[in-house]
Amino acid sequence: MRLDEYMDIERDERAERRRLAEEKSYGILDHLETFQDRFEETVQGDSLYGGVSPSIFVGRSNYPNVSTGILSPVGHDEDAASFETSAAWYDEGVSIDDVFQRRTSLLNSNRGTKVTNVADSWDGFLGTQREVAIADRPVTVEIGLDGKPSLDLDASADDVATPVGPRARARSADLAENPHVPKLVKKTLEDDDWNAEGAMTYLYRRGFDVYDINTILSAGALGQTEQRRLVPTRWSITAVDDTLGQYLRGQVKHAESVDGVEIYRNEFIGNAFWVILAPGRWEFELIELKAPGSVWNPDPEAGMYLAADREGYEGRTGYVNETAGAYHASRLGVLEHLQERGRQAKALVIRHVSDDYWGPVGVWQIRESIRHAFEGEMADAETFGDAVRDVTEYLPVSLADLRRKSTMAAGLQTDIFDFA
């Protein structure tokens, strides 16, 4: 699955994105070239024996006929778990290079299928894939392959899913061990009364993080049996963040408001985040500023690109048009913090994407950056307007620019100096 299958972009823009990535890190290209050597050392005949799989991937191109695969880190069986996207990546302080190098080591052994074929099947390739998805640790699998892998890296310009590395067509897949499946996951599989949203919330309330739930949902292992479907990875990430966000909003919207205006900041792999919480009923907005020369805005001569989406007290009913998965990931982080405190607030998140963010690594970095922002030192302000003005001092745009794009900022009283 190539970049142009994720997003409609002009050919010259696609070329510019590739040029930017190659210019920023030749090490990733070198890593792809060494993958072939590791692959040939690992494969016996035409099968990959003893590969340890930490996760799966479901594509979205040609939906409902999709490419679905089992991910295996070739030559890295002992630390297979570290190759799967998780909150631990933030704790490790991974770089963009680290993410791309780990993902280029993951062989995507895939085959085409209809999303409806999963139903309650536990046999064959789809059955093995599902076992990998619901297990709470990497599973040893034996995969029969047709030919050598295609050495390429698919990185989505929408930056929702983590990049996917080399891929090969799979003839078969079999378990080489009995996977360990948590009892709570077994319960959601056996209880046919739950819809997918209810099952997601059940697992989340009992300590499962979004990463685990996303993989289980993507494999078609949640919901009523006749309604179970494979869910493309990109869609499942957003669906889980959105579903859990709606649940948490319901928990906080009747709580007491925060007492004063609070400002939090965090920075991670070329992204800077500001979170402003102010007294009042629940309201949320995400503003994104994307610098020229970044993967989002590759023309170095272009101006700063601004995008924004928001919701009021009752939430959203329409599609998030401009900020996509980043909106749901950042909102979840804010709502988790408020729910833990037993408070509600009106919340403004500002994300500044610098030109250091040269390759899209997925919305996990947004989710974790917001989650950890609240662990840092908090600043305060007299009013919401003062907080926005204070934060704007650190942004490459004026308050007037924000007011033109942001509904929440547009409500501030205008001062002549805001146009400076």
Curated annotation (Swiss-Prot):
Keyword DNA repair (UniProt): yes
Superkingdom of this protein's organism: Archaea
Alphabetical keyword list: DNA damage, DNA repair
Pfam families found in the cross-reference section: Nre_C, Nre_N
InterPro entries (UniProt xref): Nre, Nre_C, Nre_DNA_repair, Nre_N
GO biological process, one term: DNA repair
UniProt motif PIP motif: location: 413-420
Disruption phenotype: Non-essential, but cells lacking this gene are sensitive to DNA damage induced by treatment with MMC. Does not display increased sensitivity to UV light or to the alkylating agent methyl methanesulphonate (MMS).
Family: Belongs to the Nre family.
HAMAP family, per the entry: Nre (MF_02096)
Described purpose of this protein according to its UniProt entry: Involved in DNA damage repair. Works together with the UvrABC proteins in repairing DNA damage resulting from exposure to the DNA damaging agent mitomycin C (MMC).
Subunit field text: Interacts with the DNA polymerase sliding clamp (PCNA) via the PIP (PCNA-interacting peptide) motif.
Name of the molecule in the record: DNA repair protein NreA
Source organism per UniProt: Haloferax volcanii (strain ATCC 29605 / DSM 3757 / JCM 8879 / NBRC 14742 / NCIMB 2012 / VKM B-1768 / DS2)
Gene name, Swiss-Prot/TrEMBL: nreA
